[in-house]
Amino acid sequence: ASAAKYESNDNYKFLNILDAEGYLIVPGFINAHTHIGDSIGKDMATDRGLEAVHPMRGIKKKILEKSNSQHLSTLMRASAISMMKNGITTFVDFREGGTEGVAILRNAIFDLPIKCLILGRVEYYFDIDRNGQHEDKNVQPIKKSKLPVKVLEIATNLLNVSHGFGISGANENTDSSLRQYNKLINKLSKSDGPKNRTKNIQLGIHAAESKSTVEFSLRRTGKTEVYRIVKHLKPNFVVHMTQATDEDISLIAKNEIGIVVCPRANGVLGCGIPRITHMLKSGCKVAIGTDNIMINSPDMFREMDYIWKTSRSSGINLDAKNVLKMATINASEILHLNSGCIEIGRSADFIFLDKTSIELYPIHDPYASIVHRANQNSIKGVMISGRFVNGSDL
């Protein structure tokens, strides 16, 4: 529409009209799953597989425990800036370290325009593989099946400073502790489950990331991780689902629980390729995350490119438009955000791509061009909440 048309409408007379001729305007990307706390450990354990990021015994845990909080904050801030430069306007972080961990992240990004949902974690785990004492006092044997009162108090305090819980996984929890987390979330949001939660309080958890985690759950509990999660936790979304069974995927779809896939991180860790096409055909809402900074760059362009091309290995092509939706509106709907698409009443979180850039010109299929050709060099501007992110932010 022309500027003159808008100027003649009283509803728009006080607005600045921008001439966006020559630009492709895209909703800002929503990075639906990150761990930016481990930015300090980039590429330190790319050859160690999933054990590197294990919450109870991985090298990541040791790195975070031994690192100075100021160093962590500085590098987390750098990762947030990197995300903005790549068109990410919102990210959802699973923040380890309890209330202190949340405070470190808040301090890192307090003056940056990027939006962040911080999902905190209580550093308390159950070792369902053994009944004896664990060397870590925060890891309890299975016979202690419930979260103790002191831990519940910590969890309640955590909810008061965060946007919800980002739980490690079902294998580090008992059925009882999963129900306790669900009860805490429902109490705060005054609801009885994810469909009825009135406040934007999120409950997310990793699920079916690898064959080993799936087999472990079946061996020790007789149920899949996903079955236990749906029955006892009732989260808003699950992360990964790389090795989920057909029954798992159907269960997630039936219960309207979102899925956040992190395919490049899964590739680095050797966990496989998530069956995204099958998830979508089953009725699941699927979004994208980049996962741990220590093993993967927070780049949604690369993520979309990888998803679009690896989907063809299933023999069923995933069209580029659906891939772009996973990075934008799908994530918004899963997380109940007021962004993710260009629509009146939505937050103005946009990416301005130069249609004449050497990477894109000439554009014959805009969706395909965005998904597998665009990159940081194609971006000429990023807008968050109606304001351009200025040069000092980027």
Residue ranges and their predicted role:
Residues 1-26, 155-156:
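Histidine-rich, glycine-flanked metal-binding segment
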Residues 22, 33, 87, 165, ...:
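Divalent metal-coordination and catalytic microenvironments
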Residues 28-39, 202-211:
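Histidine-centered catalytic micro-motifs
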Residues 224-236, 274-357, 373-375:
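His/Asp/Glu-enriched, well-ordered alpha-helical/loop segment
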Residues 347-394:
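C-terminal cap of metal-dependent C-N hydrolases
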Residues 40-74, 113, 127-140, 198-200, ...:
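Active-site gating loops and adjacent loop-to-helix segments of metal-dependent hydrolytic enzymes
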Residues 131-140, 159-294:
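Active-site core of metal-dependent hydrolases
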Residues 42-113, 150-160:
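Alpha-helical scaffold segments that flank or form the walls of functional sites
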